[in-house]
Amino acid sequence: MLRITALSSLSQAVTLRLEGQIVGRWVEELKRSCEELRANGDGMVLDLVNVSFIDTTGLALLSELRHGKVSLVNASPFITELLKGAGLW
């Protein structure tokens, strides 16, 4: 399961707090949420503080998002190592 919470921000960027695992069908849910919120052209921050695992499809999506205006923040040491291994951190 993946919980996605949009947080209000004083900056132009929208922050999404993610909780759970970025795997399987939840990858498409995250992609849909990002596309909807990025429609206005502002940047986006993905807060990974409560993400416990990311599979290969999740890493592929994060790689795709990083080519846009998306920043990844607050990853745990385990998630940081996964992201480093994929060249995303």
Model-predicted segments: where are they?
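Short beta-strand/loop segment at the start of cytosolic alpha/beta domains
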Residues: 1-17
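Amphipathic alpha-helical interaction surfaces in cytosolic regulatory modules
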Residues: 18-89
